[in-house]
Amino acid sequence: MRRAIGVTVLAVVGLLLLPYLLTPLYRTGHPVSTLMIWRKLSGASMSRQWIDFAAMSPALPRSVVASEDAKFCSHHGIDWDSLRDVLDDAEDGEVKRGGSTITQQVAKNLFLWPGRSVIRKALEFPLAMWIDAVLPKQRILEIYLNIAEWGPDGQFGVEAGSRYAFGRSATGLTAREAALMAAILPNPVRRSARKPGPGVRRLAGTYMVRARAAELRSCWRDDRGS
């Protein structure tokens, strides 16, 4: 009995430590998300074509950071101010967009599971801070842009999402198209950049303005210009 308990404890500890051991290896390569793996194993449709950060339209990272995590370049994996605002809103009975940073979403997508869970959040916080400490900001953003879900039929990453929405590579997206891509990120199954509704178009306009703002910090190389 004790042996079985010991083996179980070791297995649990090993599973908890595995993401921390794998993270340094993700400085290179083309990592996949747990959701991508699940869809592949379950036989559901799934498409992802990796695109290097340098090949993406310069408007994409700016639009996504402007929409998802404006303090991405200054926090260390967790935006504590945004988190406090979310908790205050929840206490007041207001339901708004979550306060997860891009780094938290990378932690969740790479190693954890979707859905709301206190246990998942407890695992996500230290893992996000570890990812921020181990990987460069540009690499974190590159991974996020390549593993986020971007379409209703298993389109993962900006390349698959761009080809689905606009019929061409993410390399040549305009600022408007990049903003439309950013606007559907909370729910790419119900929102569409291909046939954007009034709400998506309105959000895209807002994100275009934010992406051009001088105060939006950049912590990645932009060799192509914008």
Swiss-Prot record:
GO molecular function annotations of the record: pentosyltransferase activity; peptidoglycan glycosyltransferase activity
Catalysed reaction, written as an equation: [GlcNAc-(1->4)-Mur2Ac(oyl-L-Ala-gamma-D-Glu-L-Lys-D-Ala-D-Ala)](n)-di-trans,octa-cis-undecaprenyl diphosphate + beta-D-GlcNAc-(1->4)-Mur2Ac(oyl-L-Ala-gamma-D-Glu-L-Lys-D-Ala-D-Ala)-di-trans,octa-cis-undecaprenyl diphosphate = [GlcNAc-(1->4)-Mur2Ac(oyl-L-Ala-gamma-D-Glu-L-Lys-D-Ala-D-Ala)](n+1)-di-trans,octa-cis-undecaprenyl diphosphate + di-trans,octa-cis-undecaprenyl diphosphate + H(+)
Keyword DNA-binding: no
Pfam families documented for this protein: Transgly (PF00912)
Transmembrane segments: 5-25
EC class of the enzyme, as a word: transferase
A single cellular component GO annotation: plasma membrane
The protein's Enzyme Commission number: 2.4.99.28
Localization: Cell inner membrane
Keyword tags: Cell inner membrane, Cell membrane, Cell shape, Cell wall biogenesis/degradation, Glycosyltransferase, Membrane, Peptidoglycan synthesis, Transferase, Transmembrane, Transmembrane helix
UniProt pathway: Cell wall biogenesis; peptidoglycan biosynthesis
Protein name per its UniProtKB record: Biosynthetic peptidoglycan transglycosylase
